[in-house]
């Protein structure tokens, strides 16, 4: 039985099918208090209208209209008020879709010292892997993450240095690390470099 401090992350195969959809925060405020820069796109007018312009800065390297919101001296989001998000129903897409379960899924940890709260939350997640399919899918995602880290120099410009982006990329290219046999069995394999490169560029 899982320890009381552990959090159920859900069935692994079910979670994979939900990556990218809105993530309910519940009582978790780890992201809100972990020195995060939050990207907000020009197609989020509802969110932008609720954040004071003085808190927004031009997003470096992105087209005009993309902005980021920083954090205060405590590392808290400026919209985090009285222990909760003051614009929760109108929060940025980045906040809606950020799912820290991607880290344990890929066997990675966040790469920023100021994110101790997120790291603690990550260590609490426990996925259910009740069927062989769940086990092999999780193994494929972790194999993809390990491969990307080990072969980043062989894939110049394609492997993110940021562990969050790397984890999501590993989820996205997991299929190339799977082989389906005539017997119906699915197993994890190490693909050719060109196959990995092609999988990344198709995204």
Indicate where each model-derived feature is located.
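Short loop/turn segments that flank or connect secondary-structure elements
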Residues: 1-203
């Amino acid at each position: 039985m899982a320890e009381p401090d552990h959090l159920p992350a859900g069935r692994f195969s079910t979670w994979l099918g939900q990556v990218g959809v809105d993530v309910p925060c519940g009582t978790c405020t780890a992201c809100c208090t972990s020195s995060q820069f939050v990207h907000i796109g020009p197609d989020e007018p509802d969110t932008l209208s609720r954040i004071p312009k003085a808190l927004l800065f031009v997003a470096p390297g992105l087209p005009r209209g993309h902005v980021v919101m920083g954090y205060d001296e405590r590392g808290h989001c400026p919209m985090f008020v009285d222990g909760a998000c003051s614009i929760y129903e109108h929060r940025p897409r980045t906040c809606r879709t950020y799912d820290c379960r991607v880290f344990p899924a890929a066997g990675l940890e966040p790469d920023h010292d100021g994110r101790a709260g997120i790291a603690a939350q990550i260590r609490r997640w426990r996925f259910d892997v009740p069927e062989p399919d769940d086990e092999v899918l999780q193994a494929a995602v972790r194999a993809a993450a390990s491969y990307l880290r080990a072969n980043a120099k062989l894939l110049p410009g394609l492997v993110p240095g940021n562990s969050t982006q790397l984890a999501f990329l590993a989820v996205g290219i997991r299929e190339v690390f799977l082989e389906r046999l005539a017997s119906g069995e699915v197993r994890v394999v190490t693909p050719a470099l060109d196959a990995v490169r092609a999988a990344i560029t198709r995204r």
